[in-house]
Regions:
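Transmembrane beta-strands of outer-membrane beta-barrel proteins
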Residues: 29-33, 70-76, 98, 114-120, ...
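Residues that define the transmembrane beta-barrel architecture of outer-membrane proteins
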Residues: 27-29, 47-53, 70, 92-98, ...
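Short loop/turn motifs that connect adjacent beta-strands in outer-membrane beta-barrel proteins
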Residues: 21-28, 62-72, 108-113, 159-162
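Cleavable N-terminal export/targeting peptides
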Residues: 1-27
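Residues on the lipid-exposed face of transmembrane beta-strands in outer-membrane beta-barrel proteins
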Residues: 35-39, 53-59, 78-80, 100-104, ...
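Outer-membrane beta-barrel translocator domains and adjoining extracellular loop/strand segments
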Residues: 43-48, 85-92, 127-136, 179-182
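Short glycine/proline- and aromatic-enriched beta-strand/turn motifs that initiate or cap beta-hairpins
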Residues: 19-65, 172, 176-183
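Gram-negative outer-membrane beta-barrel domains
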Residues: 105-114, 123-128, 136-184
Length: 184
């Protein structure tokens, strides 16, 4: 009877210990590399020269929140895309979103990190075009910078201790981003 009781206690202890292994505990740093789908600036009149690519860093500054399954991360984000406008003889447009990123993580199940993130930064849009109208050449080149932001619901599923597949859905450079995460 004592052995059965000890076995049950050991199994419960191991079960709770396995639950306590967080995917994003305090001090953890992750790096994302993503490919965006469904841009927010360019439409069907543009063709892709460089698809929306993004990199992000996320560092956990607090964990053990919300029944021990939540954590807070801070980091940065950089995303860029380049398109050619089909209506002009030669036209290239680019968009870059860069800024700090904050995230709120909650682990529902083992190996799955779910989170909400907010990016507040700068959106840089550049264009360079050449066209002819009635045999008159028109050229323009400019860059503008304005407040940029992004908000995403994301998830990372860890395939190993270090590597995860990730997906983010929301607003920013694109509506959907898929990619990989490396955990330091």
């Amino acid at each position: 009877m004592k052995r059965i009781a000890l076995l049950i206690i050991a199994m419960l202890t191991l079960g709770f210990a396995a639950q306590a292994q967080s995917t994003f505990s305090k001090g953890t740093t992750t790096a994302n590399l993503g490919l965006g789908i469904g841009g927010t600036l360019f439409d069907k009149d543009f063709s892709v020269l460089l698809p929306p690519l993004s990199v992000g860093i996320d560092h956990s500054v607090a964990s053990g929140l919300f029944d021990g399954n939540g954590s807070i991360g801070v980091g940065g984000y950089l995303g860029a895309e380049v398109y050619r406008y089909k209506g002009f003889d030669s036209s290239v447009w680019s968009q870059t979103l860069v800024g700090p990123r904050g995230s709120l993580h909650y682990q529902f199940v083992d190996k799955l990190d779910t989170y909400f993130s907010l990016i507040l930064g700068v959106n840089i849009i550049s264009w360079n075009y050449n066209m002819k109208v009635a045999d008159v050449a028109i050229k323009d080149k400019d860059t503008s910078a304005r407040f940029g932001w992004g908000a995403h619901f994301g998830t990372r599923y860890y395939l190993s201790d270090r590597w995860a597949v990730m997906g983010e859905f929301g607003y920013g450079l694109t509506f959907l981003t898929l990619g990989a995460t490396y955990r330091f």
